[in-house]
Amino acid sequence: MYGKIERIHFVGIGGIGMSGIAEVLLNLGYKVSGSDLRGSEITQRLESLGGEIFFGHAAENVANADVVVISSAVHEDNPEVVEAHLRLIPVIPRAEMLAELMRMKYGIAVAGTHGKTTTTSMVATILSKGGIDPTIVIGGRLNSLGTNARLGQGQFLVAEADESDGSFLLLSPTIAVVTNIDADHLDFYSGIEEIKDTFVEFINKIPFYGLAVLCLDNGNVADVLPRVKKRFTSYGLSAQADFRATDVRLSGFSTSFVAHHKGVRLGEITFSMPGAHNVLNALAAIAVAMELDIPFETIQEGFAGFGGVGRRFHLKGEANGIMVVDDYGHHPTEIKATLGAAKAGFAENRLVVVFQPHRYSRTKELFEDFVKAFHDADVLILTDIYPAGEAPIEGVTAEALANRVRRHGQRDVTWISDRDKLCEHLERVLAPGDILLTLGAGNVWQVGETMLLRLKAAKES
């Protein structure tokens, strides 16, 4: 960045996407400040790295800023945004700042409706194992790093490309991965055709020497292939995919498969994350790594040491023979994949699911898809919608969803609004051998942590 930019202020710095960029900028030597409504492990980490954190949004927070960075969740009437405009301080979306970081490196951007965080994490892990030492900006905590960002000394930057508001079009990656294209963020897009058009534009932004890595198993990705004008490779379980997986085996938290490239057997891959959907994510990472000439043996070693990602089928703990697992899945496609992975890996265990819908708009637009997403749950409890800043929509409630799921044939479905009553209900329902899975992008993970404490206390009493 131009030398006169010294102090960078983030509105909503505690968000997982914002904090990663802030951490890299701190490590680059910039003065970073930011505001958020409350403290967290993320804000504490940024403070320990030298960031200045304000709690609450106030005009004076931007007084010394040279640029203000906002996420799509921050509105124009935010007092810090208003003040920045009054002071003629540039206000830019987070994707524009990420694009500026990517401009300094060769960018590897992972896009897609689902699987971005896991795939980005796999790519980052394997590139690190291969000695490339990439800069990393991930939308989740990489367990092996203990954080979601790292400044590397190598030439590459690995990051997620967020399609939710179209701002990923600001990025100009050298390698672009598209894991899938699905209907989501319909408060921004008019429908699936506009989403597909936007992904095509993203793919075609790579340079002539770049590479697109595309999932052939996804119907919407396959649909847009004739419109891709740049060099690409495909991956999937399909026999037509360039990178293909066979002999997939799922057992507990472990997944293994045999990888092939254009009909040639490469070897076996094993990693500690369940689910056939993660086989696809792994294939994407293999394709990226082999484009960068990382030996397959090194790729195997990288996967063997892959520790997973926070809030992606993450084992929180175990007590009284009950495993407590948390997952970020909040879209019907993600929910079906996660529950399917749980059933495939733990066929003998009863699956007790607590789901917190995320956003009124998403719940409304995908209501019927949600209704059909929970068939692999033995016990399903829904709690109130996490608004994520949205105003309620009349008739769109977790209770209405629970009733519709029940009418669709799901036998054991309960809606509980109050958290204490929810935990009391779980204490009555859970039995040794069960898996308690909290699902959602909001704060439903707190239910799992509370239940772990209660289960351990019950064991000691």
UniProtKB/Swiss-Prot annotation:
It catalyses: UDP-N-acetyl-alpha-D-muramate + L-alanine + ATP = UDP-N-acetyl-alpha-D-muramoyl-L-alanine + ADP + phosphate + H(+). GO terms for biological process: cell division; cell wall organization; peptidoglycan biosynthetic process; regulation of cell shape. It holds the Pfam family Mur_ligase_M. InterPro entries: Mur-like_cat_sf, Mur_ligase_C, Mur_ligase_C_dom_sf, Mur_ligase_cen, Mur_ligase_N, MurCDEF_pg_biosynth, UDP-N-AcMur_Ala_ligase_MurC. Its main location: cytoplasm. Keywords: ATP-binding, Cell cycle, Cell division, Cell shape, Cell wall biogenesis/degradation, Cytoplasm, Ligase, Nucleotide-binding, Peptidoglycan synthesis. Cell wall formation. This is UDP-N-acetylmuramate--L-alanine ligase. The gene is murC.
